[in-house]
Amino acid sequence: MTIAILPARLANQIAAGEVVERPASVIKELIENSLDAGATSIHIDVDKGGIKKIKITDNGHGIVKEELTLALSRHATSKIKSLNDLEAIGSLGFRGEALASISSVARLTLTSKPQSQATAWQAVAEGRDMSVNIKPAAHPDGTSIEVLDLFFNTPARRKFLRTEKTEFNHIDEVVRRIALAHFEVSFSLTHNGNTVRQYRMASTHAQCIKRVAMVCGPKFIEHAVEVDCPHDNMTLSGWLAKPSFSRSQNDLCYSYVNGRMMRDKLINHAIRQAYADLLPPDTYPAFVLFLQLDHREVDVNVHPSKHEVRFHQSRYVHDFIYSVCHKALTSALAGEELFTTADSDLALVPEQSYSSLGANDRQGSHSSNTPTLNYPSADYIRPLQHVNDASNSQSTSSYSGYGQQHKTNAISKIAASNYQALMTPDKGSSAQVQNTSGSDQASAQKHETTTLQNSTDQSAFLSVHQPGYALYKTENGVRVLSLFKLAKSTYGKLVEQSWQNKTEQSDCPVECLVSQPLLLPVILSLSEQQLSFVLAEQEILSNAGIVFIQQHKNKIQIRQFPALLREQDVSNALIIIIEELIEKRSFTEGEALCETNLHQSIGLAMVLAEYDETQADILLRLTKKLFHEQLSQQLLLNSIPLDLTSHIKTLF
């Protein structure tokens, strides 16, 4: 077969296969042309779901008579002139093929009048050779484009169109998406002569919120968190719905790049990752987000429908979006309970998460008496992994961040007999240990310490009970371990070793932790006491990896933070560190802080609010790695004996 150049009409119809998928894609292209023309009012009129008629009317700059024919030609555009323009596209359209493609599969009429022109002129594309006829017309300033009988000359394409209702729903969605990105423009949509949508121009912030509520619903605004974060040459703004407004489908996921509506995988992944631990499975977030950045930093010429883009610094953009969204969500949800979980009956007073305690609360806990026990309602049969086997096997129970399975309050006879078999002490066992005098108790504890140190493997962990307590078996009975206290000791040791390793590997004589620059500096408000403390101890905090500057009278801007705390909320972690150091300095009557104080305070900030079985397993492995043969001693020091035998007997 010989090679031949395709006829213009056939070439345009092939191009239309990418540009014109359905009536909604025609409307998208025409509205974007109106926006590029500077229109502030756009009216969309459709009949029969856009299959019979589509008419777009705007008040934009218009097209002069001499360029009407050219406007219907392929690759004819006023938006780019050179390769430099293509690399920094600021308009919504730029390829110059939409009108030519549409006119090749429909009957198109273009009427336009620039303000500088006395009369309006109309261009009609018709015939097999797509000849354009020009004639005068009556029309106000602006442009109207009428598209009749879409796909009339391509029956195969027309056959794939859906019902009138379905096609109009796609049109409605396109108009809604575009209306969200252009508050400065009024939009109206009519279908079969009936007005369906009417969005007035929004010039104030309140009017913008009103439009968002009209598009996404008032409940979205009620549950939304507003964000507006500039950073370098990027700005992310818009609204994020709290996880309580999660959706069963992704019908309220609106993202825009430089005013262009997107379904970009990178953007969606960053947003989904920010919601990752907050949403129940099989649900979707709701958001309206606008990303503004330098046009030279994004390539929009990578997708036929321009729904996807390519960022020159994709990882940087991804992390920026994730950081802003995650920070906004966690800040908004601070103090809120995201999901309902089963209540635990375990009450060890005054134990709480060290991360949630203030300095006064923690100080009070040091002088508290031995806590009383209310035994938990739990399945005593399910064991936790043995600490020595933890690295070789997975957790025996699955943990979900959004809730727990409700546990039965009944203790089966099998469970009771299992625990009865575990309890094999001699006379004067754990019950006696609790009731002995001070000297006898010290002697018993010393004996148990020696026994545990000689046989670490004889400690078997049985189960974990939230918020952070574990039962484990020793030769002398069952003990209740505070995972909070154990974590404080373990993380303090981890920070200490990290400090020493950094000092040994660095040529710098100044001891310092590995510091990690923050992608987005964090602004933190401090009390007068806290501010005076951090300013006075700025040098030692800097050595520990905490770098900040004073921004306002009572605010600091955190720029770098210890890498060990990368998983923690920066603001909360720093408050914990500051309060702990202030408390320690008050105990030492104003003496200079030492390295150990820093180790302990940073370790305290790493303690979680609660521990499930997986997190407890990780903590125990880390404790064993850091303390080696002292593991059993650490377990003993952070636990109390439990007389489970007498408790089980009361159940029968």
Curated annotation (Swiss-Prot):
Coiled coil: none annotated. InterPro entries: DNA_mismatch_repair_CS (IPR014762), DNA_mismatch_repair_MutL (IPR020667), DNA_mismatch_S5_2-like (IPR013507), HATPase_C_sf (IPR036890), MutL/Mlh/PMS (IPR002099), MutL/Mlh/Pms-like (IPR038973), MutL_C (IPR014790), MutL_C_regsub (IPR042121). Keywords: DNA damage, DNA repair. Pfam families: DNA_mis_repair, HATPase_c_3, MutL_C. Residues 365-375 have a biased composition (Polar residues). GO terms for biological process: mismatch repair. Residues 357-377, 425-457 are annotated as: Disordered. One of its GO terms (cellular component) is mismatch repair complex. GO terms for molecular function: ATP binding; ATP hydrolysis activity; ATP-dependent DNA damage sensor activity; mismatched DNA binding. Belongs to the DNA mismatch repair MutL/HexB family. This protein is involved in the repair of mismatches in DNA. It is required for dam-dependent methyl-directed DNA mismatch repair. May act as a 'molecular matchmaker', a protein that promotes the formation of a stable complex between two or more DNA-binding proteins in an ATP-dependent manner without itself being part of a final effector complex. This is DNA mismatch repair protein MutL. It comes from Colwellia psychrerythraea (strain 34H / ATCC BAA-681). The gene is mutL.
